[in-house]
Amino acid sequence: MSSEIAYSNTNTNTENENRNTGAGVDVNTNANANANATANATANATANATAELNLPTVDEQRQYKVQLLLHINSILLARVIQMNNSLQNNLQNNINNSNNNNIIRIQQLISQFLKRVHANLQCISQINQGVPSAKPLILTPPQLANQQQPPQDILSKLYLLLARVFEIW
């Protein structure tokens, strides 16, 4: 009979230990479940906020920067071609002092525009190489000598956008 009592006490102790251990596991499991639920809710809220704001990815930002720089370059090159044609017309006509000054001014503008194209191409190269802080050396719109820029000039607006894009991203 003493062996039955000893066996009975052993079972009671084991059952109590299992109950305590089981309760501890339940508490820890609940704490982990709550922590996981909170983490999942935070991740879902962040994902929803990102989806609502529609923030571009890093690759999309790079692509937008390159597209903007290429668009600016296409406008700059179109204007260089236009100025070069004007320059050729001035050279074909009789050259006098007033035309000579005009020719020099046009050559300076062409040089300025081509420097901008070169700076933009360097920036595109750096962006494609993965340099995160790459930005063009010239972020201001070109100033046309002896002419006021009209407020609707697309190049001025694109340079303003360019400055903002490279400032934010």
Swiss-Prot record:
Gene Ontology annotations of biological process type: chromatin remodeling; positive regulation of transcription by RNA polymerase II; regulation of transcription by RNA polymerase II
Cell wall biogenesis/degradation keyword on record: no
Residue numbers bearing the N-acetylserine modification: S2
UniProt main location, coarse: nucleus
Region (Disordered): 1-24
Keywords assigned: Acetylation, Activator, Nucleus, Repeat, Transcription, Transcription regulation
Intervals holding Sequence repeats: 28-31, 32-35, 36-39, 40-43, 44-47, 48-51, 76-80, 160-165
Positions of the UniProt region annotated as 6 X 4 AA tandem repeats of N-[AT]-[NT]-A: 28-51
Coiled coil: none
Cellular component annotations (GO), alphabetically ordered: chromatin; cytosol; nucleus; SWI/SNF complex
Localisation: Nucleus
Tagged with keyword Nucleus: yes
Biased amino acid composition, Low complexity: 9-21
Region annotated 2 X 5 AA repeats of L-L-A-R-V, chain positions: 76-165
Extra information: Present with 1030 molecules/cell in log phase SD medium.
Function: Involved in transcriptional activation. Component of the SWI/SNF complex, an ATP-dependent chromatin remodeling complex, which is required for the positive and negative regulation of gene expression of a large number of genes. It changes chromatin structure by altering DNA-histone contacts within a nucleosome, leading eventually to a change in nucleosome position, thus facilitating or repressing binding of gene-specific transcription factors.
Subunit structure: Component of the SWI/SNF global transcription activator complex. The 1.14 MDa SWI/SNF complex is composed of 11 different subunits: one copy each of SWI1, SNF2/SWI2, SNF5, SNF12/SWP73, ARP7/SWP61, ARP9/SWP59; two copies each of SWI3, SNF6, SNF11, SWP82; and three copies of TAF14/SWP29.
Name of the protein: Transcription regulatory protein SNF11
Originating organism: Saccharomyces cerevisiae (strain ATCC 204508 / S288c) (Baker's yeast)
Gene it is expressed from: SNF11
